[in-house]
Amino acid sequence: MSTLEENYQYCHQIMKDYSKSFSYAFDMLPEQQRRAIWAIYAVCRIVDDSIDVHQDVEYLHKINRDVKAIEHQTTTTFESDDRIMTAFADAATHFQMNFQALYDLIDTVEADQHFEMFETDRGLLDYCYGVAGTVGVLLIPILATPPSDEAYEYGKQLGEALQLTNILRDVGEDYRNGRIYFSKARLNEFNVSIADEIERDQLSDNYIKIWEFYATLADNNYDMVLNHLDVYNEESRMIIELAAQVYRGILTEVRKADYSLKDRAYVSKWKKHKIYRNLKKKYKD
């Protein structure tokens, strides 16, 4: 049987495998906080992977039952991943977990198996909350103690901005996988067809306008979060700013690539390290 410390280290390794740069940043938090972050990240990861990788809805249901058992403290044996759930259960004894956000994530991941285009931006924004705003909310009790309503709102906004940024980065790739995340109403408003844009040698002005419309929504969220860093614990602020700056950098890279629908734009390791070094200097000073 694994020890509690081994369970936390298992969660830590999952975070390092999937998100090395952010894992490194979170590792600067005090021990109890960073261990809770590892556990939350690992739970969210297996929720995503249950459908995205394994197409196993029953495993997702097992995760859901395990989370309920942890919330109500009804068992110490789990149906899904015992190591992750044991670490998460321990973290939940130290921090005021927002279990509803985790249930919302699980519900969104399950519903996403039967994806349909969103009629309006309300559907798109609800989706962004469900897959990423929820994660922002889950992290707030660790990053802002005690968690305030404002901190929860900005955590939600940051998560939604990160997801919207992912969507703006992956328009072409998502289309080839049978998905269009821009809402029908907004596509009609801008008179844009993603199928037609894929076939063009040069993207239309209208496509660039709709892309920038959504980028502005993400940017507004980033601005809101960065203007209210004081709601977070002092040791958490650099991490929040790092996430916002790195992901905002993705929008810049898409523009530099002329909004290409063929290749995925990304922030280079060198640029990430530069952002990290600059922030470390800023917060050290």
Curated annotation (Swiss-Prot):
Question: Where does this protein act, in terms of pathway?
Answer: Carotenoid biosynthesis; staphyloxanthin biosynthesis; staphyloxanthin from farnesyl diphosphate: step 1/5
Q: Quick check: keyword Metal-binding in the entry?
A: yes
Q: What does the UniProt record say this protein does?
A: Involved in the biosynthesis of the yellow-orange carotenoid staphyloxanthin, which plays a role in the virulence via its protective function against oxidative stress. Catalyzes the head-to-head condensation of two molecules of farnesyl diphosphate (FPP) into the colorless C(30) carotenoid 4,4'-diapophytoene (dehydrosqualene).
User: Any binding details for the cofactor?
Assistant: Binds 2 Mg(2+) ions per subunit.
Which PANTHER family does UniProt cross-reference here? BIFUNCTIONAL LYCOPENE CYCLASE/PHYTOENE SYNTHASE
Chain sites annotated for binding Mg(2+) 2 = N166, D170
Q: Which cofactor does it need?
A: Mg(2+)
Enzyme Commission code(s) on record: 2.5.1.96
Query: Cross-referenced SUPFAM superfamilies, in alphabetical order?
Result: Terpenoid synthases
Taxonomy, top ranks, is:
Bacteria, Bacillati, Bacillota, Bacilli, Bacillales
Residues annotated to bind Mg(2+) 1: D48, D52
Q: Which residues form the signal peptide?
A: none
Q: What keywords are assigned to this protein?
A: Carotenoid biosynthesis, Magnesium, Metal-binding, Transferase, Virulence
Look up the domain of life of the source. Answer: Bacteria
This protein's record includes keyword Transcription: no
Group of enzyme by EC: transferase
* Residues engaged in binding (2E,6E)-farnesyl diphosphate 2: R45, Q163
Task: Supply the gene name.
Answer: crtM
What family classification does the UniProt entry report for this protein? Answer: Belongs to the phytoene/squalene synthase family. CrtM subfamily.
Catalytic reaction annotation: 2 (2E,6E)-farnesyl diphosphate = 15-cis-4,4'-diapophytoene + 2 diphosphate
Which species is this record about?
Staphylococcus haemolyticus (strain JCSC1435)
| Chain residues that bind (2E,6E)-farnesyl diphosphate 1 | Y18, S19, K20, S21, Y41, R45, R169, Y247
GO BP terms: carotenoid biosynthetic process
One of the entry's Gene Ontology molecular-function terms is: geranylgeranyl diphosphate synthase activity
The protein's name: 4,4'-diapophytoene synthase
